[in-house]
């Protein structure tokens, strides 16, 4: 029997509403094709919520998210709200409380070069033409960003500042399991990134990851130091499948992966908790300079919806159908203005229509 799922849709600001509209078109297409039902409720978040409710994350929005199986998030922020105190601004006042409230400890950042877009990569042609398809699995709530104690003290030559890198066994185990589960859906390779030659936290990280790996005999586990990993991504990114990283290493690696694709407007992102409840959003920003012009690239938002189907709703076939439709459109040279160069560019809405049509035709 086909499932029914509740989705909280938070379009937000800038290009958020117009790219979210394209995600709706694509979700309509997979609903029809695969027979499940997505009950979608829309809520204000970010700047529009400040304008309408006086705060970036209204109680009604939080309640809508709590009653849902997943959150499909657009983008927030813009010059209109930059005068506000940092904690009242759309980004910090909406995204951080959502991550904290739902205990979203895992960040997933896919990065790939789509066929036909190799020329946008800053990598040498002979490297980019090999292609790559990577998912960075980043631990999001532990490590040096949150460890205590941290601070500054003293003065003069003796003044010092310090941070603490702390990881508990349970934090490493739960993020490792998501990496191995992800690998089972892909090429069955996990690269665990650490600095176990100098850091005690990385030694524990490596030990726990090796223990978890025993539960996934079909998956090949590789360990790699962070400094080598950053170099290998430039030399031959095609060797990687799933990259498992601590918070700070994942911060670095996921941005490097994004940059070597050469098309930031195409990259989705997911943040998950222990129950696989997730928030799914484009990796880019709200792009207020092009908002309302029907020229934004909706692919990142559409691929975020595919991640939602895969990780929170367990609708793998529908997720793949969306990803294949995106690839078909790009391979056919159907591109929005950010990628079309001097060629004919599709509008935001035309791109959404094309991808939905490919799903229905498949």
Swiss-Prot record:
Stated family: Belongs to the isocitrate and isopropylmalate dehydrogenases family. LeuB type 1 subfamily.
NCBIfam families: leuB
UniProt key word Ribonucleoprotein: no
Residues of the signal peptide: none
Protein function: Catalyzes the oxidation of 3-carboxy-2-hydroxy-4-methylpentanoate (3-isopropylmalate) to 3-carboxy-4-methyl-2-oxopentanoate. The product decarboxylates to 4-methyl-2 oxopentanoate.
Chain residues that bind NAD(+): 78-91, 285-297
Cofactor(s) demanded: Mg(2+); Mn(2+)
Metabolic or biological pathway, per its Swiss-Prot or TrEMBL entry: Amino-acid biosynthesis; L-leucine biosynthesis; L-leucine from 3-methyl-2-oxobutanoate: step 3/4
Catalysed reaction equations from the record: (2R,3S)-3-isopropylmalate + NAD(+) = 4-methyl-2-oxopentanoate + CO2 + NADH
Binding site for Mg(2+): 227, 251, 255
UniProt-listed InterPro entries: IsoCit/isopropylmalate_DH_CS, IsoPropMal-DH-like_dom, Isopropylmalate_DH
GO cellular component terms, A-Z: cytosol
Residues involved in substrate binding: 99, 109, 138, 227
GO biological process: L-leucine biosynthetic process
Site (Important for catalysis): 145, 195
Places the protein is found: Cytoplasm
Top-rank EC class of the record's enzyme: oxidoreductase
Name of the protein: 3-isopropylmalate dehydrogenase
Native species: Photobacterium profundum (strain SS9)
